[in-house]
Amino acid sequence: MPALWLRCGLCLALLLPAARASSGSQVCDCNGKSRQCIFDQELHKQTGNGFRCLNCNDNTDGIHCERCKAGFYRQRERDRCLPCNCNSKGSLSARCDNSGRCSCKPGVTGDRCDRCLPGFHTLTDAGCAQDQRLLDSKCDCDPAGISGPCDSGRCVCKPAVTGERCDRCRPGYYHLDGGNPQGCTQCFCYGHSASCHSSGDYSVHKIISAFHQDVDGWKAVQRNGSPAKLQWSQRHRDIFSSARRSDPVYFVAPAKFLGNQQVSYGQSLSFDYRVDRGGRHPSAHDVILEGAGLRITAPLMPLSKTLPCGITKTYTFRLNEHPSSNWSPQLSYFEYRRLLRNLTALRIRATYGEYSTGYIDNVTLISARPVSGAPAPWVEQCVCPVGYKGQFCQDCASGYKRDSARLGPFGTCIPCNCQGGGACDPDTGDCYSGDENPDIPECADCPIGFYNDPQDPRSCKPCPCRNGFSCSVMPETEEVVCNNCPQGVTGARCELCADGYFGDPFGERGPVRPCQPCQCNNNVDPSASGNCDRLTGRCLKCIHNTAGVHCDQCKAGYYGDPLAPNPADKCRACNCNPVGSEPVECRSDGSCVCKPGFGGLSCEHAALTSCPACYNQVKVQMDQFMQQLQILEALISKAQGGAVPNAELEGRMQQAEQALRDILREAQISQDAVRSFNLRVAKARTQENSYRDRLDDLKMTVERVRALGSQYQNQVQDTRRLITQMRLSLEESEASLQNTNIPPSEHYVGPNGFKSLAQEATRLADSHVQSASNMEQLAKETQEYSKELMSLVREALQEGGGSGSLDGAVVQRLVGKLQKTKSLAQELSREATQTDMEADRSYQHSLHLLNSVSQIQGVNDQSLQVEAKRLRQKADSLSNRVTKHMDEFKHVQSNLGNWEEETRQLLQNGKNGRQTSDQLLSRANLAKSRAQEALSMGNATFYEVENILKNLREFDLQVGDKRAEAEEAMKRLSYISQKVAGASDKTKQAEAALGSAAADAQRAKNAAREALEISGKIEQEIGGLNLEANVTADGALAMEKGLATLKSEMREVEGELSRKEQEFDMDMDAVQMVIAEAQRVENRAKNAGVTIQDTLNTLDGILHLIDQPGSVDEERLILLEQKLFRAKTQINSQLRPLMSELEERAHRQKGHLRFLETSIDGILADVKNLENIRDNLPPGCYNTQALEQQ
């Protein structure tokens, strides 16, 4: 009865406040995580709301289910709390932050604290440690062979790598390479051998197309294979192709990139590419390789990204079948090697969409060739089995033939089946006759299990092999050796077990036991030899810290699972303290056996007789709680016996509850303090990161300033070096001129007749040298004044930023420097003009010399006249170039005047404030660049004058050389005159004959032009029809997506692009006309030196062509009309049905949209209904029955 009264009293005490609160505004606030709550009087006193939530959902906790339970986290307030899953050994506690990251122990990393940091190993309850006693703890791994960090103290090797340090290739692989995802390359050997190594006879060879002179054999084709226009840029030294339509155009590689490219396996194919205009979305067929009936493709970049517009970027593709190389479809290893062995096509996409232009340059394929040079270790050298030979086992050995000739080197080699064991052709299998093999004696045809007796080849002897195995005789020792022993068996008589196997196949040491693989539980190195005893099978070279007959136990001082598949999970060091633990061993779970007086996970702590002083307060509090608990237990026992009044028991329980509340409140205060401290730490870290970013920005700014300064110094050094080279060239020219003997300008009077002319040329050369020195000095002074000008501008900026105006003295000084710079520029102009005048005088002297030579008595050689005319034209060209550069220099001089005006304007604006000072700095930089430009143009003018002087000197030498030829020509003058007269007659005849031929050619040309115009109109008509189809299709799509506005804008952009392209084409045509005109002039200059005999041959050829006049190609016109008819037929038969189908699809799509709208309306009505139900629910739900049962 008292117990019942207590329970009812508690229920009444809990329900009455709830009833009182129900009349106010207080309700259960559980953040949507609970439907149950209870009233707490103390909580009501503290917060004014006494409802405490019960049974919080979604792993939440707290008075209002406002936080996650210990060991759970969430990123946002309303999210479900997710488990932290912190590793119990590697984390400091089960808690984690809002992103799910746990707090790790020393040496541990990872979001879950489940991995060791690099250089650490053995994750235990104390964290990860580095055991100095173990050699493996150094993690001395070969970086080319590892696939991840060394967490367990042992190197984690790539799939094709082995060894304790991951420094060796597995059997069947070779060439350890850090760039290979597998680590090593699988032996190819055409599938005939699994043993190979890197060849030392090959060196690196790069197959390159850099397009320095022409297209280098490359072509451009449409997707259907039809040819497209490919152009070479002389300026940029690259090739490009354009497309007006959306069909892609591809660059096609020449023959040097095709054929047998086996030695390029695993290497890279790279090229520089950029696209201008058009679409810029990559496709799966951007790069295409074809060969041996196979075809693979790859995109330039991930399909989710966009190609950069107008930016040249290098794209690299690795030639292997690994998924990271992005080739599709993914071939097998041998399929990829078969493709490279007979590569028939390499295509790279050029255009993307309409009006697109693609540029490509520096196409490079890494290959190898058998010459000396940088080694190419990726080329293999195979160890061929019996019946094969060659570096790659690609040939059949003597006495063997192809099982299938159509497979080529991939086919299997089998023994020849010839009478008497004769040899045969390795490809066809045809047996050689006896006279073709005189060294092979006639032998008996022995069956399997027998061999020819070396002493008597006509007789057969049984093989000394059991089970009827075949055998052969070694030619060197005549020893009989058994062939084709079964797997796992070896020896001359197949009497031994092979490496990695054990047993006794003949029972020579006991009962017969067939050879079987050693059972070492994957705890031996498969690339090592002698892993087990060949007779007993006992494992001899256990690794991973294992031991035992079958490597199935951990070594002393280690624990774990020796049969685990992951090496990191196998046997690990016990890590016991040698002082506090029993002999260095541990239990199966890694726990150490401690000596008396020691404790801890590794027995590293000595036992303590009492707790530290910092625990005294806690101990006192715990003792008080224990006393109260004992009193409560006594009261409860008495209450059950009926000897203690319930009021006393109730009071004691309230005291206990109060004590518990105090503890909870103190814990909450501590938790709040920790949370506040964490927020302060986070804020400090944020500020630290901000400061670090600002510091990095400052460092980058300093580096950029240093780089600009270094670049400027390099430019100054280059200018000085060029001036020095020009001075040396002038000195060398002067020395050459002094050592040159020049013939006389008048009639020939002797070897010293041109002495005065040589002295005049020497004087001119000296004056040129002096002019160059003056120009150099003026250029240096201009550069120094430019530097001073920049420093003054910077001072003006600094003063303007501080006081808002410039000092008057600084302004005056700046103007003075400007005037002095202007005067130096004018003086530089005068020097250049004087140099031009001297060069012109030299030119006039040369013309006078030419006229004098042409007046030599008795000389009338036409070839000499032609040569003199060519040299005169060359001199005129050089003079024109000098005039042109003088005009450019005057233009630069006029720019200097503009610079003066702009600088004065900058000075005036600098007085108005800081913003105007910034403008002054920018324009001063512009002035500096123009001054440098003037200096470079002056240097260029000096360079041109030097070349003119050099050419004039060469001209004098050439005239002297022609003197001997002129004397020889005088002897042949009469004969040449006769030939010239005959040639003149024939020329007149040819001109008469050419009159009618020219008219016929003009008519043929007009007819061809009309045919081209007709074909152009046909193409325009077809394009118009296609455009109408596209407009119809776009109209159908516009009905669904509402893209009419975007479409019009795109048309405007396309029109603008078309106009730009037309302007570009016009510019290109003008450039081509200039180039063609220059080419024609050059050709005429070259043809001037052709002999009379060549002229006669040309006339004979012209007369022969006149006898075979051309005609208009009417068949081409008929063919064009037929194509037009077929195009119209195709439009009526295919395009119109397609338009109807698109209209039908649009109609169906509209119906589907109407159905979706109806469904959405229904769903919205259901949602509205649910909201009404939610609004009518009561604010709280109180389970009084559940309270009664507590």
From Swiss-Prot:
Q: Which SMART domains match?
A: EGF, EGF_Lam, LamB
Give each disulfide bond as a residue pair: C28-C37, C30-C53, C56-C65, C68-C81, C84-C96, C86-C102, C104-C113, C116-C128, C139-C150, C141-C155, C157-C166, C169-C184, C463-C471, C465-C482, C485-C494, C497-C515, C518-C532, C520-C539, C542-C551, C554-C571, C574-C586, C576-C592, C594-C603
| Compartments (UniProt record) | Secreted, Extracellular space, Extracellular matrix, Basement membrane
This protein's major location comes to secreted
Cite the Laminin EGF-like domain residue spans from the record. Answer: 28-83, 84-130, 139-186, 187-196, 382-415, 416-462, 463-517, 518-573, 574-603
Q: Name one Pfam family in it.
A: EGF_laminin
Question: Segment Domain II and I: which positions?
Answer: 604-1190
**Leader sequence residues:** 1-21
Which keywords appear in this protein's UniProt record, sorted alphabetically? Basement membrane, Cell adhesion, Coiled coil, Disulfide bond, Extracellular matrix, Glycoprotein, Heparin-binding, Laminin EGF-like domain, Proteoglycan, Repeat, Secreted, Signal
Under the heading CDD domains, the entry gives:
EGF_Lam
Q: List the GO biological process terms.
A: animal organ morphogenesis; axon guidance; cell adhesion; tissue development
Q: Which domain of life is it from?
A: Eukaryota
Q: Which residues form a coiled coil?
A: 613-718, 809-1073, 1114-1190
Q: How is it modified after translation?
A: O-glycosylated; contains chondroitin sulfate (CS).
Which SUPFAM superfamilies does this one have? EGF/Laminin
Asked if Disulfide bond is a keyword of the record, the answer is yes
Q: Which residues are glycosylated?
A: N342, N362, S803, N939, N1030
Q: Which residues form the Laminin IV type A domain?
A: 213-381
Q: Does the keyword Protein biosynthesis apply?
A: no
The record's subunit annotation is: Laminin is a complex glycoprotein, consisting of three different polypeptide chains (alpha, beta, gamma), which are bound to each other by disulfide bonds into a cross-shaped molecule comprising one long and three short arms with globules at each end. Gamma-2 is a subunit of laminin-5 (laminin-332 or epiligrin/kalinin/nicein).
Instruction: Tell me the domain comment.
Output: The alpha-helical domains I and II are thought to interact with other laminin chains to form a coiled coil structure.
| Protein task | Binding to cells via a high affinity receptor, laminin is thought to mediate the attachment, migration and organization of cells into tissues during embryonic development by interacting with other extracellular matrix components. Ladsin exerts cell-scattering activity toward a wide variety of cells, including epithelial, endothelial, and fibroblastic cells.
What further note is attached to this protein's record?
Binds heparin.
What is the protein name stated in its UniProt record?
Answer: Laminin subunit gamma-2
The root-end lineage is:
Eukaryota, Metazoa, Chordata, Craniata, Vertebrata
